[in-house]
Amino acid sequence: MTLDYIYHSGFAIEMEGVTVIIDYYKDSSETEHNRGIVHDYLLQRPGKLYVLATHFHPDHFNREILTWKEQRPDIQYIFSKDILKSHRAKAEDAFYIKKGETYEDETIRIDAFGSTDVGSSFLLHLQDWSIFHAGDLNNWHWSEESTEEEIRKANVDFLAEVKYLKEKAPNIDLVLFPVDRRMGKDYMKGAKQFIEQIKTTIFVPMHFSEDYEGGNALRSFAKNAGCRFISITHRGESFEITK
């Protein structure tokens, strides 16, 4: 399998005969609009093409993806239902799922799980791989700014969603999860709790924009917990991954 880091929380998964693009925000070029690994390569890649969006926030859902069907009329879009409810897309634009619902065809299964923000997180089952994209699921709190009650509630809400996921998927091959230093000193707490609760084979940080150092700071914790950790160094970076 090839994992492509596009930007922020945007990734692509390449397997034989299939490409999956998740939470596209911007393409990988830092200088040219609509240039990079998506426009220059992935949209031309042979095989099935799935485009997923976990929620309507603009750093996870760029309406430009709907224009890709002009080039690739075979695209299958799978979006979280909040995108429809917030009128970011029309009913006919995609297949919509929310927590507890599934999209499945002969190639892929996508189970929607919860979020501690809006929308969903997605668990993909593809060619013997289980792949979890957290969307905006995280223990979102800002220790220097949040009240004790806000911190407590964030912790309770997050652990409840992780528990629900663990009941269905106690082991996951590949996890893409927010590690965002803008949250302050406890910014890695949610990622650490996730790894402690769910047996994760490979962990990949996301949602850090250009802060590669902050995203990769979880590496030692993940390795000590028995995870393989993928350190990202630039937009458009590709990784050949085996179990």
Per-segment meaning from a language model:
Residues 4-6, 19, 88-103, 183, ...:
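Binuclear metal-ion centers of metallo-dependent hydrolases, dominated by the metallo-beta-lactamase
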Residues 2-5, 20-23, 109-114, 130-136, ...:
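Active-site-proximal beta-strand elements of phosphoester/diester hydrolases
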Residues 38-103:
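Active-site HxH/HxHxD metal-binding segment of metal-dependent hydrolases
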Residues 21-25, 47-59, 77-81, 132-135, ...:
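Active-site neighborhood of phospho(di)ester-bond hydrolases with catalytic His/Asp-centered motifs
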Residues 28-29, 56-61, 83-87, 101-103, ...:
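Active-site environment of divalent metal-dependent phosphoester hydrolases
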Residues 12-52, 63-68, 137-168:
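Pre-active-site segment of Zn-dependent metallo-hydrolases
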